[in-house]
Design a protein with these regions (language model features):
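Glycine-enriched, solvent-exposed interface loops adjoining structured elements
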Residues: 1-238
Length: 238
């Protein structure tokens, strides 16, 4: 749903005049609604790793400790990396991390290096120990702060600039969040709306993008690891 359609829908539900346009409007009420929707979207984007704002980045390794600014590697509004997703696709091996400050300093103070590469993000840089081999293809997933998509389908952003901008987060949650924020600004009772909203956010985060089945007995079911497999019964005993 576009930004314009969302605010028009909200106005109909709330009994407010329905605007013909939002972006660039000088109507104080319309300007406020756009600002509140942006506030809601930014806050909701920080609540979890929504699949709609999760992206993959690829990087060609260089033979130095610093691989460069993380925002230059993950270029679409980098917010944070998803742990344990960096892989060296050339060697088919994980890049371990992010490690803590303590582990990193222990690595730097060690007389030996390796054998596994480990990383952390410090000062906005992706740094790796030991120094990796150049020209390997690395890939990882990250969560973006850009929750808005332009009509061209390729430009992602954090703030609205056109009525045709669409939103990458659950529409009903954005609508519910806009409702309680608007009531708060108007000095109306918003406690129940906010409580319902929070419950729906938690429920949506639990289902967003699908979730793996957790096995308490450590059996993965359909994705067995390589190794020797022993049948659970019907053993041939001499």
């Amino acid at each position: 749903m576009t930004m314009l359609a969302t605010i028009q829908r909200f106005c109909r539900r709330t009994g407010l005049p329905v605007p013909a346009t939002v972006a660039g409007s000088t109507d104080s009420q319309v300007v406020q609604l756009q600002a509140l929707l942006e506030e809601e979207g930014q806050d909701l984007a920080r609540r979890g790793a929504w699949q709609g704002i999760t992206f993959e980045a690829t990087h060609t390794s260089v033979a130095t400790e610093s691989q460069g600014a993380i925002t230059s590697i993950a270029t679409n509004g980098f917010n944070y990396i998803k742990n344990q997703t960096i892989w060296d696709r050339t060697e088919n091996l994980p890049i371990i991390g992010p490690v803590s400050s303590e582990v990193w300093q222990a690595l730097k103070g060690s007389v030996s290096t390796g054998p596994r590469f480990q990383f952390r993000i410090r000062g906005g840089l992706l740094i790796v120990n030991p120094v990796p081999t150049a020209n390997h293809t690395w890939a990882f997933e990250y969560v973006s702060k850009n929750w808005i998509l332009a009509a061209n389908g390729t430009t992602y952003k954090e703030y609205f600039t056109a009525d045709t901008d669409t939103m990458l987060l659950p529409e009903e949650l954005l609508m519910m969040g806009l409702r309680w924020r608007w009531k708060k600004e108007k000095g109306l009772d918003y406690a129940e709306d906010m409580r319902t909203y929070e419950m729906q956010v938690k429920d949506a985060l639990g289902r967003d993008g699908g979730k793996p089945v957790l096995h308490m007995d450590h059996e993965s079911g359909r994705s067995p690891s390589p190794g020797i497999f022993v049948p659970q019964g019907s053993w041939s005993i001499p």
